[in-house]
Amino acid sequence: MQMDNDFIKKLGYRALDNRLKRISDRMSHDTRKFFKQIDIDVEPSWHLVFKLLGEYKTLTMVEIAQQLGYTHPSMVVMLKKMTTKGYIVSEQDSIDKRKQNLRLTQKSIDLLPDLELIWHSCEDAIFKMLNEDLSILDRLDEIEESLKSIPFNERFYNEYQKQKI
């Protein structure tokens, strides 16, 4: 029996989440390979933290999570790895002792010019991969806004209830 080589693609919109994850995983994997190739010990997902702390200098974990729309647990893992690698430091807030302020280390600050060049090259590669057509971003914005207004689990549950009738 001949099998279709791309089951996810064959399913179309019914596997949208899997397809988006596959694209994301592929880009992250390839970016990780690129960083190894140029001997820079950075994870692809860290670039947004570098950019935020480069711009704002000091932020709390909660502020970073809010800016990126990430969950607190995923931020804890990411920021711990960045701290372990010596890219960020955590300092107790002088006013609110419960808060930990995060900032880039000198190692990160020294690396920023190289990272800026890398990010610009990555942006150019993405732009060209999209054939200079950024309309996909508008569609992604619509999907994200739609999910904010009615979470997917509610949509899913409503459709499930209709099917049961």
Role assignments for model-derived ranges:
Residues M1-D39:
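N-terminal leader segment of winged-helix/HTH proteins
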Residues M27-F34, L68, L111-L130, I143-I150, ...:
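Alpha-helical linker/hinge and terminal dimerization helices associated
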Residues H29-T71:
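N-terminal helix-turn-helix DNA-binding core of bacterial DNA-binding proteins
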Residues M1-I8, E132-I165:
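C-terminal regulatory/oligomerization modules of transcriptional regulators
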Residues K80-D138:
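Charged, amphipathic alpha-helical coiled-coil/dimerization segments
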Residues G12, L16, S45-W46, K107:
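N-terminal positioning helix adjacent to the helix-turn-helix/winged-helix DNA-binding module
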Residues D25, D39-I40, T58, E116, ...:
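Alpha-helix boundary/capping and short turn/kink residues
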